[in-house]
Swiss-Prot record:
Glycosylation sites: N93
Gene: PGA53
Entry's transmembrane regions: none
Compositional bias annotation for Low complexity: 57-69, 77-101
Location(s), subcellular: Cell membrane
One GO cellular component term: plasma membrane
Listed name of the protein: GPI-anchored protein 53
Signal peptide location: 1-17
Maturation propeptide residues: 117-139
Lipidation (GPI-anchor amidated glycine): G116
Membrane topology reported for the UniProt record: Lipid-anchor; GPI-anchor
Annotated spans, Disordered: 57-115
Entry keyword set: Cell membrane, Glycoprotein, GPI-anchor, Lipoprotein, Membrane, Signal
Primary location group: membrane
Length: 139
């Protein structure tokens, strides 16, 4: 009986955590069908949007050196850390190949929509967690 109740509560919590209101279909042409409730267009062509987005280059480098020397009673530790971050954002409307500042790269986007999945999981955990703990204490 306890296992059945735990299974039922687990399924109910999972159902609450999954956002069933938005249906996404991604096919070979990168077309995405979205729900109008989220104020997105019904069909979005990701390839066209990628062409319109400004190119962004983010370069980050970090180096850390740690040296530890231990003798009988003496221990010496030195730590050196250096970090630099360079962010460059360029927006280009021309597609001429003679431009020397343009870089050709293909970017891949997993999802461009804000589905609120993390918020729904956090809300379900905030509500379902204490309920599950209370049920566990009662059983």
């Amino acid at each position: 009986m306890k296992f059945q109740l735990l299974t039922l509560v687990s399924i109910a919590t999972t159902t609450l955590a999954i956002n069933l209101e938005q249906v996404r279909l991604i096919n070979d042409d990168e077309l995405m069908v979205q729900d109008a409730q989220f104020d997105y267009p019904a069909i979005v062509n990701l390839k066209d949007q990628d062409a319109e987005i400004a190119k962004k280059t983010i370069t980050s480098s970090s180096s850390t050196t740690t040296t530890t020397t231990a003798k009988k009673d003496k221990k010496t530790t030195s730590t050196t850390s250096a970090s630099s971050t360079t962010t460059t954002s360029t927006k280009s409307n021309s597609t001429s190949p003679s431009s020397s500042s343009s870089k050709k790269h293909k970017s891949e986007t997993a999802s461009i929509t804000k589905t609120g999945g993390a918020d729904s999981v956090a809300a379900a955990a905030a509500v379902g967690g204490p309920i599950l703990a209370a049920l566990a204490l009662l059983l």
